[in-house]
Amino acid sequence: MYIHSSKYLSYDDMKSSIERGEKMLQRKKIAVLGGDARYLELIKSLTSSDDLDILLVGFDQLNPGFSAVKQVSMNELEPTELSAVILPLSGVDEFGNVETVFSNKQITLKVDWINKLPETCTVFTGITTPFLKENVAARNLKFIPLMNRNDIAIYNSIPTAEGAIMLTIKHTNITIQHANVFLLGLGRVGTTCVQKFKALGANVWSVSKNKEDLARADVMGVTPLPLEQLSAHIHAADIVINTIPAKVLTKKEIQLMGSQAVILDLASKPGGTDFSFAKARGVEAIHALGLPGIVAPKTSGEILANAIKEML
């Protein structure tokens, strides 16, 4: 007599078991190396994907408390197994050192480690730096500077502009309403800053060398000012906000500014301001980097996570 035994799997059970095995084989290992408060939300969002294993380096001062997350050291991280590497938005310095906010340990990307990454690996960073250009992009790995994407930069410009407003309130003794705000550059960040400061009642001057930008500024209802004419008008500025990644606020312009004026430089390193001369002149100049991570890390992290998950 044939007796059915539970040790035999049904067709549906076998199919389900095979599918689970395939999913296990398809899991991707993602390494997150350093980062600021934005990356906490990024990590949380990535863990919602059931096909990702997240390896964290540079977060030893935190207990993220997320499933599918493991804290490891750089020595424990096997590059040949990685599907993606997520670097800080600031990239790395010329020696390959990674910025870490949640660790006191030095993390360094070494060339021989990078060379072991599989060709299918995607390397995410915020900006391109010389080290990354030479050692990652040149290897023909999929290399994605996130801040080069218009959608990310536009969304990110909102907390940047709000951060500029916060710093303006903190570092001046006047209201934004009726203040003379000179905004240098009308790119993604500059455009949002113009809109926000204008909405608060500031007298906004939009400064650019680009004729299309000047026309757009005029249409937006602010005062367009060619960059070459900046020195003739900058004496009227209460607040100068720079978004141009080139030296535009030199000794010539700064010495014409009032001593109570404040410079907020939002451009990436090294900025567009002669900070040494501003200090000697007694003009407060602030290089305000990473404002989204300070002002709205949760929102900024969600923006990054959505973009990265779309590309994985």
Sequence positions of predicted segments:
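NAD(P)-binding Rossmann-fold cofactor-contacting core
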Residues: 51-66, 202-220
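Short acidic-hydrophobic, aromatic-tinged amphipathic segments that line or gate anion-handling sites
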Residues: 70-76, 224-228
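Short, Lys/Arg-enriched N-terminal segments with co-localized hydrophobic residues
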Residues: 11-23
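Glycine-rich adenosine-cofactor-binding loop
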Residues: 30-40, 177-197
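Rossmann-like adenosine-cofactor binding region
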Residues: 90, 108-116, 220-293
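Rossmann-fold NAD(P)-binding glycine/threonine-rich loop
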Residues: 127-143, 267-295, 299-308
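Glycine/serine-rich phosphate-binding loop and adjoining beta1-alpha1 elements at the start
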Residues: 25, 84-178, 307
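Residues in the short beta-alpha loop(s) of Rossmann-like NAD(P)-binding domains
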Residues: 36, 58-60, 129, 209-210, ...
